[in-house]
Amino acid sequence: MISKEEKYFENDGRGFDHLRIRDSTPIQPPVPVITINGQTISTAGNITTISGEAKSGKSGFAGILISAALSQNGIVESLDELYVQPNTLGKGVLYFDTEHSQPTHWKNHLSILNRCGLESCPDYFGSYNLKT
C-alpha cells in the first residue's frame, strides 16, 4: 500500500524523484577543499565567499586561495595552517571580482598566476570583473 506522502511525491513524469532527500538517503560526507587550522572552510561543489571590512585583506587572501586551487600541489606559501586540496584534475576555478577596476583586477590576476608558478591562464580558471 502506498502512503499519502509517497502518493503525493510519486514521480509524475517530471523526473525529480532522484533529487529528493529522505532520512534513508545515503549521503557521503563532504570532501574538504579548503581547511584552516583543521576546520573545513570550503567543500567540493560549493561556492566560497570571502567578506570583511574595507582594506582588511580580502583580495590578498582570495588570491592566495585561488593560486593554491590552481596549483597541482595545493601548497600555500608561508601559511602552514592553511590547506587547499591539490587540483590535479584541473577542475574549474572561478573568481568574480565585484570591487576592483579592470586594471587592478588584471594586476591581481597576474599575481595569482605568478604565485602558483603559471605563466599563462589555464583553461580551467575563469577570472571575471563584475564591477559596473
What are these regions (language model features)?
Residues 6-37:
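N-terminal pre-Walker A segment at the start of P-loop NTPase domains
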Residues 48-51, 94:
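Short hydrophobic/aromatic beta-strand immediately N-terminal to the Walker A/P-loop
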Residues 16, 77-80, 86-132:
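Conserved inter-motif catalytic segment of the P-loop NTP-binding fold
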Residues 54:
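The conserved Walker
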Residues 70:
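Gly/Ala-rich phosphate-binding loop of Rossmann-like dinucleotide-binding domains
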Residues 39-45, 85-88:
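Phosphate-binding P-loop
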Residues 57-58:
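Conserved glycine(s) of the Walker
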Residues 61-65:
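Hydrophobic positions on the alpha1 helix immediately C-terminal to the Walker A/P-loop
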